[in-house]
Amino acid sequence: MNQAELQRHMEEVSLQFFQKEFRHQAVFNARLRTTGGRYLLKSHNIEMNPKYLENFGLAYFIGIMKHELCHYHLHIEKKGYQHRDQDFRELLKKVDAPRFCATIPREITMHEYTCKSCGKSFLRQRRFNVNRYRCGSCGGKLIQIGSKKIYTENA
């Protein structure tokens, strides 16, 4: 999906669920890390995180669009647009939009080291020079076995 398709989807979702036009811009912002989208109060534009579209699909992404459009329409109408406001919570329920986003799984590389003497195994996120360090248990020489990618739920 590109910027033009995002804009078109945002306008369609606004008309379908809110029966109101979306008159501002919707753009992708790949720098967003822990949030699915962001409504900008001054410009009235909406920024969307493209990683949520890649990881969770279009149906979930439309839910995030509905959430951001709740902020948008309530702010334009000068009603309570913040998460804690009653108007916002009621509109979320009415259009069946999520209140919070799921976290995107993060990819972490783990490096595995083993002691030549005692065979103890170590997992570390950072690589280190095996010639400079020794086993903490027996003082033996360490060798790097390899590295593997692990997906975590933390953001």
Swiss-Prot record:
What positions does the entry give for Zn(2+) binding? H67, H71
Query: Catalytic site residues?
Result: E68
- Top-rank lineage group of the source organism: Bacteria
Supply one GO CC term from the record.
cytoplasm
Pfam families (UniProt xref): SprT-like, Zn_ribbon_SprT
Which terms in the Gene Ontology molecular function aspect does this entry carry? zinc ion binding
Query: In the UniProt record, does the keyword Cytoplasm occur?
Result: yes
Known cofactor(s): Zn(2+)
Q: Which GO terms describe its biological process?
A: response to stress
All copies of the SprT-like domain together span 7-145
Q: Where in the cell is it found?
A: Cytoplasm
Q: Which UniProt keywords are given for this protein, alphabetically ordered?
A: Cytoplasm, Metal-binding, Zinc
Tell me how the cofactor is bound. Binds 1 zinc ion.
Q: Which family does this protein fall into?
A: Belongs to the SprT family.
**NCBIfam families named among the record's database cross-references:** PRK04351.1 (NF003339)
Q: Name the chain's protein.
A: Protein SprT-like
This protein's species is Listeria monocytogenes serotype 4a (strain HCC23)
| Species lineage | Bacteria, Bacillati, Bacillota, Bacilli, Bacillales
